[in-house]
Amino acid sequence: MSKDNLHRYLFENADVRGELVQLEQSYQEILSAHTYPTQIQELLGELMAATSLLTATLKFSGDISVQLQGDGPISLAVINGNNLQQLRGVARWDGELSDGATLQQLFGKGHMVITLTPAKGERYQGVVALDKDSLAACLEEYFTQSEQLPTKISLFANGKQAAGMLLQVLPSEGDHNAEFEHLEQLTATVKAEELFELEAEEVLHRLYHQEEVRLFDPIEVTFSCTCSRERSASAIRTVSKAEIDTIIAEQGKIEMGCEYCNTTYDFDSIDVEAIFSNTQAPETKQ
């Protein structure tokens, strides 16, 4: 059974729902494309877990992007995904990163952009300042602004595994603050080691053994890159043929690299002629 799963659960006697995600292989696949410093490895793990949790809240088929931008040492960290829990991500940085640096110190003056793109319907975008010390706190602020529902998020990553939990009041009439605060206090006792080492059922039992919890079937989370030779050919087609021919003459080929999975697609003069004559370029992938 895959270690990479998202688990949704409900409390039978409270209008509160929860999610728990545990990631290993998909997390490692994202990290394997680049040699990231430890701080970015952990940040991408937290961001990946967060995106998985957010994706499970979507009520439509479509895509999600959670992007952190700033003017600090880390300029970009992004995880893109969809309602099928297929995720990919990348980060950009400059120079050495300080050990123990907070989110604000890593990104400087920055913001988080969450973009929801339904397969049908209008795109929604929410923006939250990166003015908290943790990614989890910034995401809680996003939920406060966008859904106005009390939400608690916990995120963990160590470069090998990533995990997260989300606790949220269900939309309903009445005041459920007391119920939520009680469950929030229980959830806050979870340790990273428990999420990394134990099965989800055992984690939930340890946290809520006095509560009645309904656990749904797990949803597998995978790394999935959307790059392709066809997409690269389409990008080449947006540049003038004269400019492309010049590059071919100087370099012998055009290399199109994917930042997410580090795959390189090579196009030679024959491929380019095929692209601009609207015929399919030969399949060549390195």
UniProtKB/Swiss-Prot annotation:
Its main location: cytoplasm. Gene3D superfamilies: helix hairpin bin, Hsp33 domain, HSP33 redox switch-like. Under oxidizing conditions two disulfide bonds are formed involving the reactive cysteines. Under reducing conditions zinc is bound to the reactive cysteines and the protein is inactive. One of its GO terms (molecular function) is unfolded protein binding. It comes from the Bacteria. The keyword Manganese does not apply. It is found in: Cytoplasm. Keywords: Chaperone, Cytoplasm, Disulfide bond, Redox-active center, Zinc. Pfam families: HSP33. GO terms for biological process: protein refolding. Coiled coil: none annotated. InterPro entries: Heat_shock_Hsp33, Heat_shock_Hsp33_C, Heat_shock_Hsp33_N, Hsp33_helix_hairpin_bin_dom_sf. Disulfide bonds join C225-C227, C258-C261. GO terms for cellular component: cytoplasm. Redox regulated molecular chaperone. Protects both thermally unfolding and oxidatively damaged proteins from irreversible aggregation. Plays an important role in the bacterial defense system toward oxidative stress. Belongs to the HSP33 family. This is 33 kDa chaperonin. It comes from Shewanella sediminis (strain HAW-EB3).
